[in-house]
């Protein structure tokens, strides 16, 4: 694992969580989702080239990914259903629940279905789809010449631009969680190792002693795109996917090309605290809604009874400050008591 890629992944997870609890200034956090899929495709392409694809290898790869995705989803869903039942807000729609349990809800274009129950679980459904497609893509796509890969991406990108043009918020959100749309992010990530190999042959790229300059350029490009997103309503139809492709691709490439020679930004992203949070990243992302419920229904009332209101502070307004440490604590507990024991049981052989 490239530490800086993990660090950026955690950084975006934390910002997404803050956006979900009401920080509207972070409404561009779709860039984080784009990064997740691109970095996943990139790392898989580095580790699993699948030059020789056979049924046994595919089944082993797919089964391992299925076992990593479904148990955490079912565990989180059970927690959510239990909490909703205790609060008296539980409403069961059998079809919707069935689609959610099987992670097929992301294929629906209906808002109440793809955002049902644990709202972020659509991400797992799309990620699993990308995982299941990966061996086939790796076998047929990765061996292509770079120019042929870029032609494929250009065609897919043009299709995405045309499809998204003129979309309203409802239809754009449906496409935002639709697996084939996110597969483009994933495929871009799969292409980047080839781009990096070519970049390394150039006289300038990747040759400096450390990556400070390259990191600053990548962050500047990403920041400029964020500012364009906020100030130019004309880009809104493509604000969930297309406009982030180049900035995030550049960021991932810099992380890879300067792995082991990080500048100050890279060293921050590779720092031990972020890497430690990276060990519970999946749990943190999935449990963010549970953490919000725990705070709003348990901790905030307790803080109110302890006299926080007399200090002029509304306990409920502190959720954006408390969600991160509480979420990390819950993620660590679930990782220690559920994920790790289950992984030892499933993957010990």
What are the language-model segments listed below?
Residues 13-21, 102-107, 154-167, 219-231, ...:
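Aromatic-anchored segments of alpha-helical transmembrane domains
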Residues 14, 39, 74, 78-82, ...:
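Generic alpha-helical transmembrane segments of integral inner-membrane proteins
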Residues 2-3, 23-33, 112-126, 166-188, ...:
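Interfacial loop-to-helix transition and helix-capping segments at the boundaries
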Residues 5, 49-85, 91-103, 125-130, ...:
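Transmembrane alpha-helical segments and their boundary/interface "anchor" motifs
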Residues 1, 49-56, 60, 139-147, ...:
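Membrane-interface junctions at the ends of membrane-embedded or membrane-associated helices
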């Amino acid at each position: 694992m490239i530490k800086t890629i993990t660090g950026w992944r955690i950084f975006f997870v934390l910002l997404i969580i803050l956006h979900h609890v009401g920080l509207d200034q972070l409404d561009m956090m779709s860039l984080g989702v784009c990064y997740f899929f691109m970095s996943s495709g990139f790392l898989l392409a580095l580790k699993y080239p699948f030059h020789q694809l056979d049924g046994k290898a595919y089944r082993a790869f797919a089964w391992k990914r299925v076992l990593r995705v479904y148990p955490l989803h079912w565990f989180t869903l059970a927690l959510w259903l239990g909490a909703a039942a205790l609060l008296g807000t539980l409403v069961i729609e059998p079809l919707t629940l069935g689609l959610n349990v099987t992670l097929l809800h992301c294929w629906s274009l209906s808002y109440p279905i793809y955002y049902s129950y644990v709202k972020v679980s659509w991400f797992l459904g799309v990620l699993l789809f990308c995982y299941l497609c990966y061996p086939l893509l790796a076998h047929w796509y990765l061996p292509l010449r770079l120019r042929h890969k870029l032609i494929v991406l250009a065609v897919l990108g043009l299709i995405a631009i045309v499809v998204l043009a003129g979309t309203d918020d409802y239809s754009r959100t449906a496409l935002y969680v639709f697996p084939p749309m996110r597969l483009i992010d994933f495929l871009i990530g799969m292409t980047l190792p080839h781009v990096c190999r070519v970049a390394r042959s150039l006289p300038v790229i990747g040759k400096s002693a450390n990556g400070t300059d390259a990191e600053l350029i990548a962050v500047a490009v990403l920041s400029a795109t964020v500012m364009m997103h906020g100030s130019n309503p004309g880009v809104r139809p493509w604000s969930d996917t297309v406009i982030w492709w180049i900035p995030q691709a550049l960021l991932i490439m810099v992380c890879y090309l300067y792995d082991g020679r990080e500048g100050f930004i890279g060293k921050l992203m590779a720092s031990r605290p972020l890497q430690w949070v990276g060990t519970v990243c999946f749990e943190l992302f999935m449990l963010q809604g549970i953490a919000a419920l725990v705070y709003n229904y348990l901790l905030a009332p307790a803080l109110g009874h302890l006299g926080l209101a007399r200090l002029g502070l509304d306990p409920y307004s502190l959720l954006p400050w408390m969600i991160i440490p509480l979420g990390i604590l819950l993620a660590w507990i679930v990782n220690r008591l559920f994920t790790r024991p289950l992984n030892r049981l499933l993957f010990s052989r």
